[in-house]
């Protein structure tokens, strides 16, 4: 036998972004919809005042795994008053809290797009030192308003920081660059072997979310994202750790709304379930070497 006999499994996670019910109801619905686990913000109301052991018990009852999301800076768009040291101080506390939940992985939305390149580099170096001590995989998300907001700077950062692992959310970069991300682009090529988790939302050149990924008017955008996601799977390092994807259509101005009424154009819960099913049939994990 030559090469590695390991092959990564693919797991799909249900996002609790915008979820207003209990953890129990989320776990039960995720199980019905065929998800393998939940992705939840560390400060989500459904976890409030619940001991870590109780969170695990409730997830295990529905055979659901867990990805924890940590957001620094006060909100998803970070306060400009927060310094790098402020972000790092929060991470010191939140990484301990997240680890206690025994997650599959931890996703970080951190840093600020307002910092200069030297400050960004110092922040990332300090952050990666902290991640070294965490017993589960920790990824930084390619999120607008954050340290990895700019795709064109990413290749040099990946060279500078070989320990940096990524959550790929290409929809943010569509909005930042006013173009679709495609597999031929330098940042997509550079990041392919560093991606451990995907946020599968479909963006377009004018925004981070289409109204419905399976509407025919968005076919080009869906296919561009799918080809990038498949590249990430193809370039993933053989491992006994699963590759994970979270369909992440959501609220907060991402899902377009009807004028005047403010009603969403589509049901994000239904879209995410449909997206998970589509991803299972449309993406292929590379076979193990033999």
Regions found by a protein language model. Give the residues of each.
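N-terminal pre-domain/capping segments
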Residues: 1-93, 99, 273-290
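Histidine-acidic metal/acid-base catalytic patches
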Residues: 2-5, 24-31, 155, 160-164, ...
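Active-site beta-loop-alpha junctions enriched in small/polar residues
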Residues: 13-18, 41-45, 71-75, 111-113, ...
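Charged helix-capping and loop-helix junction motifs
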Residues: 52-55, 84-91, 120-126, 151-155, ...
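Alpha-helix-loop-beta-strand connector modules within alpha/beta enzyme cores
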Residues: 55-74, 124-135, 161, 226-230
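Surface-exposed, active-site-proximal loop segments in enzymatic domains
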Residues: 72-89, 114-119, 209-220, 254-264
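Active-site acidic/histidine proton-transfer and metal-coordination neighborhood
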Residues: 80-165
């Amino acid at each position: 036998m030559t090469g590695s006999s390991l092959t990564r499994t693919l797991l799909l996670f249900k996002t609790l972004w915008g979820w207003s019910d209990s953890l129990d109801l989320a776990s039960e619905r995720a199980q019905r919809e065929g998800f393998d686990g939940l992705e939840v913000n560390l400060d989500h109301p459904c976890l409030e005042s619940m001991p870590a052991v109780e969170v695990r018990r409730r997830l295990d009852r529905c055979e659901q795994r867990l990805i924890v999301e940590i957001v620094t800076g006060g909100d998803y768009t970070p306060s400009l008053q927060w310094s790098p040291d402020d972000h790092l101080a929060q991470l010191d506390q939140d990484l301990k809290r997240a680890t206690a939940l025994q997650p599959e992985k931890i996703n970080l939305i951190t840093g600020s797009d307002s910092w200069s390149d030297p400050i960004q580099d110092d922040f990332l170096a300090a952050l990666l030192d902290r991640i070294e001590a965490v017993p589960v995989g920790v990824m930084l998300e390619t999120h607008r308003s954050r340290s990895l907001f700019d795709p064109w700077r990413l290749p040099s950062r990946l060279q500078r920081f070989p320990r940096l692992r990524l959550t790929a959310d290409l929809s943010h970069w569509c909005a930042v660059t006013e173009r679709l991300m495609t597999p031929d682009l330098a940042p997509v090529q550079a990041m392919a072997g560093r991606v451990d988790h995907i946020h599968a939302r479909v963006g377009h050149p004018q925004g981070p979310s289409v109204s419905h990924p399976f509407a025919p008017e968005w076919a080009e955008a869906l296919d561009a994202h799918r080809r990038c996601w498949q590249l990430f799977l193809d370039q993933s390092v053989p491992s006994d750790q699963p590759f994970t994807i979270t369909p992440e259509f959501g609220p907060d101005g991402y899902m377009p709304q009807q004028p005047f009424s403010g009603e969403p154009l589509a049901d994000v819960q239904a879209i995410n379930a449909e997206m998970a099913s589509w991803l299972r049939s449309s993406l292929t994990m590379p076979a193990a070497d033999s």
